[in-house]
C-alpha cells in the first residue's frame, strides 16, 4: 500500500526536533506533488498530453510521492479526453482511474485527520483530500450519467449526493476564510510571518507560505528544507506566469481583442504576475478553494438545469441548486491560474455559447437583480460586498469579462487548438462568421496532437460552414471525421449528405453554377440513404444518440414519402431540407448574418419538388417554423409571428374549457415544444417587459408538452433556462 505521508521514512526513534523536521519535509513534499500534478494537467491544456502523462509517471515512481493527487490528475486528463470525444474505451478508462482516485482520496483524508497532519494555515487537516474526493466523485458521476444505464445513473446520483454533502461543509470553511481575508486583519506579509515557516541563512531570509506553522530553530537554518521550499515557490511562480511548461510568460502574448489580426496588448509590457494573483497563497490553499468553488459551482448549475420532475424529487432530500450561486462560484474558480480555473472557463464557454443555448441571445430579459441579491445576501452574509462579486446582469451577459478570460487562456496555452476553437466559437456567437472561419483556418488541423480536439475543431468548422452556406467544405469536413472520430459515423454521413442535397438544390435554382450538379445529386442520395446502415457502429453508448434517432426517423420519413408519392428519385421525397433543421440544433439562426438569412429564406420558400408541392402537413409545419425564425432574425417579427400563430401552433395544441390540450404527434417530436418556446421569444421581442407573464405561459406550455421526446435534453434545458429567467424577472 502506498504511504501518503511517508515521504521521508519512519518516525520510529526520532527526537522531537527530528520529528518536526520530518513533518516539514512531508508538508513540502505534498505541496511539491500538487504542483507537479497541476503542471501535468497544464501540459494537456497546451495540447501536450504525452508530456503531462510522462511527468505524472515519473512522479508516481518516486518513493513517498502523494499518489492521491497524481492519480486524480491522471483521472482529470482522461476525463477531458473522454468528454471531448465521448468514445467507449476512453470513457471506461477515465471512470476506472477516477474510481481509484475517489478511494485513495477518502483514505488520505482519514489518514490526515487521524494523524492531525496540518498542511494549511486556514483549513483543517484532511480538507485538501476532501476536495480531491469530491472532485473525483463529481467527474466519475458525470461519466456514469453519460453511460445511459439506469443502474449507473442511480449510482451516479448517490455519488453526487455524497459530493454535495461534503462540498456544503467545505464551502462553509472556504467562505469563512474569504471573509477573514477581506476583513481588517493583518496584512498578508504580517500574517505570513505569524503563521508560516521562515528560513534564515547568512545570505537570505525566506518565508514559505506552504509551511503553515513557525519553524524550529534547527529547521530555520536547514539548507535542504530551504532549497525544497524555494523550489516549490519557483514552481508556483512559473505556473502563475505560464512559463512552467516551457512557454514564455503569457503576458507577452496577451491581447485586448478577439480575432486573427489582433496584436498583443500594449499594457502587456508593464504586466506582472502580481497584477492577477495572490503571490502569498500556498499551493494547498489555492487547490482547496479553487477546487471547492469549481465543483460546488458546477453541481449547483447542473442541478438547477434538471427537468422539474427530477429536480422536485432531488429537492425533497435537500439536493437542489441555485444557478446564480453556482455561476458565481465557477466564475470565482476561473480567477485561479490552475486546472480548476481552466475547466471552469470551458464550462462557462459551454454554458454561454454552447449548443443548448442556456443563454439565448434573443431572450435578453434584464434580470431582477434586487431580488436575487437580497436572497444571496441572506445566504452568504453580504457576499455581494466581496471583491469580484458578479450581479445578475453580469452573470447573464458577462460580455468582455468572458472574452478577457478566454484571451488569457489563449495567451497561457499558445500551442492548444482547444482555446483557439473557443475563440472562434465566440467570434461566431458575435456574428463575425468570416473572422471565426479565418481563425479556424489559421491552424493546420493535422498539427493538433490531441485527437479529440482535432475532431471537435473539424466538426465546429463544419457547423460554421453550414451557417455560411459553404456546403462543399462542410461536407468535406464531415466526411473527414470518419477517419478521426468514433463518435457517430451515421450522423456525420447523414449531415454530409444534407450538405450535398442543399448544393444540388442551389444549382437547380441557379444560385450555384460550378458544373457539379450531378455529383451533388449522387452524393446526397448515397450518403443520406446509406447513413442508417452505420448506426450502432463506433458509438460510445449502448443506445443510439438523440441525433442518431433524429436521423433514422428522418430517413424513414423520406422513404415513406417516396412510396406514398410513387417517386423514382429518392431526393424528391425530401421536403424541407434537413440541413436547416440541423442548423437550428446548433444555434445557427442566431449566428447567421443578414445575407446568410436571406439565402436561408430563399431556399425555404423558392425551391420546389414533389414532396414540397404535396404540402404534407407535418413537413409544412417544419418549414413554416424555420421560416418564422428566419423572418424574426431579419427584423420582420410581425410576419414571423403571424406564420407561427396561424399555421404552426394550431397543429400543436388547442384550448378546451380554458385548459391547454396537446395534439399527440410523433412525426417531428423536437419541433412542437421548440415552436412553443419560439412563440415565447416572439412575445418578448414584440411586447418587452409588459409581456413577461404571457412569455411565462408559453414557456410553461413548452415545458409541459411531453415528459420525454427526441432531443428532449437539448430542447428541454433551453426551455427551462428561459423560464427561470422570466420567473426571476417577474419576482
Curated annotation (Swiss-Prot):
The keyword Nucleus applies. The gene is IML2. Residues 10-26 have a biased composition (Polar residues). Residues 1-26 are annotated as: Disordered. Inclusion body (IB) resident protein that interacts strongly with lipid droplet (LD) proteins. Involved in LD-mediated IB clearing after protein folding stress, probably by enabling access to the IBs of an LD-stored soluble sterol derivative that acts as a chaperone in inclusion clearing. GO terms for biological process: cellular response to misfolded protein. Its main location: cytoplasm. Keywords: Cytoplasm, Nucleus, Phosphoprotein. The modification Phosphothreonine is found at residue 380. GO terms for cellular component: cytoplasm; mitochondrial outer membrane; mitochondrion; nucleus. InterPro entries: Iml2/TPR_39. It comes from Saccharomyces cerevisiae (strain ATCC 204508 / S288c). It comes from the Eukaryota. The modification Phosphoserine is found at residues 265, 268, 378, 383, 392. Interacts with lipid droplet proteins PET10 and PDR16. This is Inclusion body clearance protein IML2. Present with 4980 molecules/cell in log phase SD medium. It is found in: Cytoplasm; Nucleus. Belongs to the IML2 family.
Amino acid at each position: 500500500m502506498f504511504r501518503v505521508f511517508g515521504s521521508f521514512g519512519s518516525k520510529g526513534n526520532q527526537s522531537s526536533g527530528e520529528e518536526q523536521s520530518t513533518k516539514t519535509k512531508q508538508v513540502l513534499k505534498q505541496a511539491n506533488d500538487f504542483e507537479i500534478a497541476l503542471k501535468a494537467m497544464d501540459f494537456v491544456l497546451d495540447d501536450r498530453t504525452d508530456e503531462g502523462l510522462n511527468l505524472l509517471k515519473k512522479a508516481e515512481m518516486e518513493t513517498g510521492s502523494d499518489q492521491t493527487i497524481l492519480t486524480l490528475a491522471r483521472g482529470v486528463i482522461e476525463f477531458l479526453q473522454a468528454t471531448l470525444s465521448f468514445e467507449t474505451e476512453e470513457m471506461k478508462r477515465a471512470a476506472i482511474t477516477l474510481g481509484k482516485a475517489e478511494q485513495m482520496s477518502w483514505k488520505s483524508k482519514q489518514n490526515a485527520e487521524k494523524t492531525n497532519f496540518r498542511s494549511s494555515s486556514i483549513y483543517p487537516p484532511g480538507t485538501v483530500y476532501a476536495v480531491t474526493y469530491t472532485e473525483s466523485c463529481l467527474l466519475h458521476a458525470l461519466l456514469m450519467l453519460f453511460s445511459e444505464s439506469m443502474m449507473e445513473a442511480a449510482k451516479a446520483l448517490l455519488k453526487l449526493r455524497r459530493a454535495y454533502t461534503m462540498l456544503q461543509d467545505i464551502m462553509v470553511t472556504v467562505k469563512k476564510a474569504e471573509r477573514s481575508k477581506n476583513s481588517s486583519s493583518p496584512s498578508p506579509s504580517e500574517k505570513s510571518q505569524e503563521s508560516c515557516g521562515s528560513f534564515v541563512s547568512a545570505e537570505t531570509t525566506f518565508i514559505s507560505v506552504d509551511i503553515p506553522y513557525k519553524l524550529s530553530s534547527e529547521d530555520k537554518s536547514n539548507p535542504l528544507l530551504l532549497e525544497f521550499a524555494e523550489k516549490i515557490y519557483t514552481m508556483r511562480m512559473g505556473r502563475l506566469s505560464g512559463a512552467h511548461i516551457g512557454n514564455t510568460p503569457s503576458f507577452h502574448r496577451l491581447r485586448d481583442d478577439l480575432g486573427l489580426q489582433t496584436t498583443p496588448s500594449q499594457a502587456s509590457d508593464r504586466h506582472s504576475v502580481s497584477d492577477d494573483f495572490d503571490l502569498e497563497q500556498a499551493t494547498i490553499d489555492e487547490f482547496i478553494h479553487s477546487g471547492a468553488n469549481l465543483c460546488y459551482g458546477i453541481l449547483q448549475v447542473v442541478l438547477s438545469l434538471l427537468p422539474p420532475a427530477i429536480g422536485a424529487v432531488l429537492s425533497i432530500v435537500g439536493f437542489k441548486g441555485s444557478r446564480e450561486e453556482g455561476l458565481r462560484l465557477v466564475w470565482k474558480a476561473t480567477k485561479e491560474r490552475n486546472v480548476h480555473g481552466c475547466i471552469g472557463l470551458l464550462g462557462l464557454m459551454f454554458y454561454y455559447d454552447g449548443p443548448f443555448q442556456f443563454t439565448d441571445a434573443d431572450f435578453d430579459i434584464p434580470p431582477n437583480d434586487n431580488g436575487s441579491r437580497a436572497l444571496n445576501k441572506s445566504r452568504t452574509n453580504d457576499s455581494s460586498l466581496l471583491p469580484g462579486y458578479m450581479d445578475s446582469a453580469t452573470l447573464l451577459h458577462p460580455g468582455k469579462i468572458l472574452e478577457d478570460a478566454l484571451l488569457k487562456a489563449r495567451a497561457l496555452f499558445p500551442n492548444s487548438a482547444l482555446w483557439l476553437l473557443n475563440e472562434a466559437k465566440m467570434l461566431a456567437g458575435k456574428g463575425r462568421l468570416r473572422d471565426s472561419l479565418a481563425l479556424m483556418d489559421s491552424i493546420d488541423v493535422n498539427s493538433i496532437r490531441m485527437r479529440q480536439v482535432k475532431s471537435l475543431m473539424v466538426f465546429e468548422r463544419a457547423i460554421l460552414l453550414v451557417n455560411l452556406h459553404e456546403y462543399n467544405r462542410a461536407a468535406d469536413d464531415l466526411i473527414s471525421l470518419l477517419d478521426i472520430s468514433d463518435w457517430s459515423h451515421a450522423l456525420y454521413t447523414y449531415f454530409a449528405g444534407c450538405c450535398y442535397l442543399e448544393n444540388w438544390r442551389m444549382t437547380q435554382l441557379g444560385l450555384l453554377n460550378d458544373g457539379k450538379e450531378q455529383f451533388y445529386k449522387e452524393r446526397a442520395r448515397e450518403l443520406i440513404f446509406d447513413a442508417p446502415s452505420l448506426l450502432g457502429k463506433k458509438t460510445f453508448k449502448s443506445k443510439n444518440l438523440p441525433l442518431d434517432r433524429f436521423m433514422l426517423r428522418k430517413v424513414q420519413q423520406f422513404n415513406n414519402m417516396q412510396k406514398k408519392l410513387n417517386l423514382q428519385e429518392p431526393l424528391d421525397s425530401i421536403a424541407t431540407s434537413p440541413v436547416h433543421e440541423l442548423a437550428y440544433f446548433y444555434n445557427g439562426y442566431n449566428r447567421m448574418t443578414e445575407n446568410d438569412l436571406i439565402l436561408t429564406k430563399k431556399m425555404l420558400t423558392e425551391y420546389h419538388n414533389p414532396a414540397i408541392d404535396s404540402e404534407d402537413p407535418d413537413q409544412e409545419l417544419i418549414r413554416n417554423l424555420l421560416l418564422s425564425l428566419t423572418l424574426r432574425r431579419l427584423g420582420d417579427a410581425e410576419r414571423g409571428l403571424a406564420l407561427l400563430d396561424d399555421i404552426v401552433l394550431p397543429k400543436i395544441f388547442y384550448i378546451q374549457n380554458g385548459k391547454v390540450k396537446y395534439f399527440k404527434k410523433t412525426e417531428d417530436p423536437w419541433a412542437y415544444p421548440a415552436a412553443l418556446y419560439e412563440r415565447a421569444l416572439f412575445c418578448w421581442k414584440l411586447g418587452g417587459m409588459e409581456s413577461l407573464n404571457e412569455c411565462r405561459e408559453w414557456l410553461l406550455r413548452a415545458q409541459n408538452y411531453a415528459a420525454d421526446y427526441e432531443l428532449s435534453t437539448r430542447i428541454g434545458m433551453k426551455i427551462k433556462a428561459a423560464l427561470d429567467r422570466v420567473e426571476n424577472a417577474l419576482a
